[in-house]
C-alpha cells in the first residue's frame, strides 16, 4: 500500500474552524496493491467535511445501511456528523485521494458548485488534473 498524507499543524484531530471561508485541515492519498482491505468506520462522522476522489479501481461506501460501489471518476462528499463507513480492497487496486476541510462559508461554496444536501456521490470524470490538485494540497500542507 502506498500512502502520502499531510495535516495542518501536524495534528490528526478533526477540527471545526469558522475563522476563514474554507480551511484545508488534512489531505492525502492511498493506493492499495497487496493489502487485502482498508476499512474506515466513523459512526458519528467528523466535525469537518470530507471529499474523496476515486482515481482508479473502486470503493465500497455505506449510506443509510446500504452498500454503494463507487468507481473511478467519482467523488464522495461527507458533511459534518454524518456516519462514515467505507472500505477499499487490494484486489480492486483502489487509488483514492481525500481532503478534510472546514470554514465559515463551506456550505455556500459547495452549494454554488452543485453539491446538494443529502447526496453523497457525484461523477466528475477521470482526469490527471484532479490528482495533481490533490498532490499540490498534500505538498502545501507538508511544508
What label would you give each PLM region?
Residues 109-143:
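Amphipathic alpha-helical segments enriched in hydrophobic/aromatic residues interleaved with Lys/Arg
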Residues 67, 81-105:
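Ligand-binding loop in jelly-roll beta-barrel domains
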Residues 65-79:
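Short acidic-glycine-tyrosine-enriched beta hairpin
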Residues 71, 107-108:
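DNA-contacting interfaces and partner/effector-binding or oligomerization modules
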Residues 23, 50-53, 102-105, 129-133:
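Amphipathic, well-ordered alpha-helical segments in soluble domains
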Residues 49, 75, 94-96:
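Structural motif
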Amino acid at each position: 500500500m502506498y500512502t502520502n498524507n499531510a495535516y495542518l499543524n501536524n495534528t490528526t484531530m478533526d477540527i471545526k474552524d469558522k475563522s476563514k471561508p474554507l480551511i484545508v485541515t488534512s489531505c492525502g492519498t492511498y493506493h492499495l496493491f497487496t493489502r487485502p482491505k482498508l476499512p474506515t468506520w466513523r459512526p458519528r462522522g467528523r466535525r469537518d467535511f470530507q471529499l474523496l476522489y476515486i482515481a482508479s479501481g473502486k470503493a465500497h461506501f455505506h449510506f443509510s445501511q446500504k452498500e454503494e460501489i463507487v468507481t473511478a471518476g467519482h467523488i464522495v462528499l461527507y458533511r459534518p456528523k454524518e456516519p462514515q463507513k467505507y472500505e477499499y480492497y487490494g484486489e480492486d487496486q483502489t487509488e483514492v485521494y481525500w481532503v478534510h476541510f472546514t470554514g465559515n462559508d463551506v456550505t455556500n461554496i459547495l452549494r454554488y458548485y452543485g453539491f446538494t444536501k443529502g447526496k453523497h456521490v457525484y461523477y466528475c470524470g477521470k482526469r490527471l488534473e484532479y490528482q495533481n490538485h490533490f498532490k499540490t494540497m498534500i505538498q502545501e500542507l507538508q511544508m
